[in-house]
Amino acid sequence: MRLRGLEVICYSRRVPPYRNSELLGELGARYISSQQTTLTEASKQFGPFDLIFEASGFSPLAFQAAEALGKNGVLVLSSVTGGEKKVEVNTDRINQGFVLGNKVMVGTVNASRADFISGVNDLVKAEAFYPGWLNKLLTTRIDGLDNYAEMLRHLIEDKEAIKVYVEVAQEG
């Protein structure tokens, strides 16, 4: 979204500073911790949110986002959640806010070939605009496909990993 000139605010659980918050800062994005600021407080502090792209995997956040969304705003839900989380929500306030505020909520999955190509193009642009930044995302290298157990361990347990990747073949 920074590549498209948008102001970006990332809202996540972990308190900064840490690697992700620093990387976002390098792009000119703001990082806010849910441990320090509610989404509603962030909306008041930085102005109403025109677009919220929810990808946390924490379903209650979708309803908080619905309340924090500004007039004429769009809430995009992109995470598939499992489990049976239950929260109490003020459905009348959310409904009224969406109707009178002309808000939109949509769900999306970006799984087509065109989405993949668009993603690759954005990665190329990101490298041009922010040289070297993408390599900082590649935090955990796994050598060979036969080390899938190690890859899964990092994906599940390594809280410092941003992107775990498999080096399929050595160059040469």
Question: PLM features: residue spans?
Answer:
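Short strand-turn motif at the edge of the Rossmann-like AdoMet-binding core
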Residues: 78-82, 108-110
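Short, conserved catalytic or adaptor-binding loops enriched in Gly and charged residues
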Residues: 22-25, 94-101, 125-135
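Short beta-strand/turn micro-motifs composed of small residues
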Residues: 12, 79, 168
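C-terminal hydrophobic helical "lid"/dimerization subdomain
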Residues: 63-66, 113-172
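Rossmann-fold NAD(P)-binding glycine/threonine-rich loop
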Residues: 80-102, 120-121
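Helix-to-beta-strand junctions that scaffold the AdoMet/dcAdoMet cofactor pocket
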Residues: 69-71
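Adenosine-nucleotide cofactor-binding segment
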Residues: 2-64
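Short glycine-centered segments of the SAM/dcSAM-binding site in methyltransferase folds
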Residues: 73-74, 104
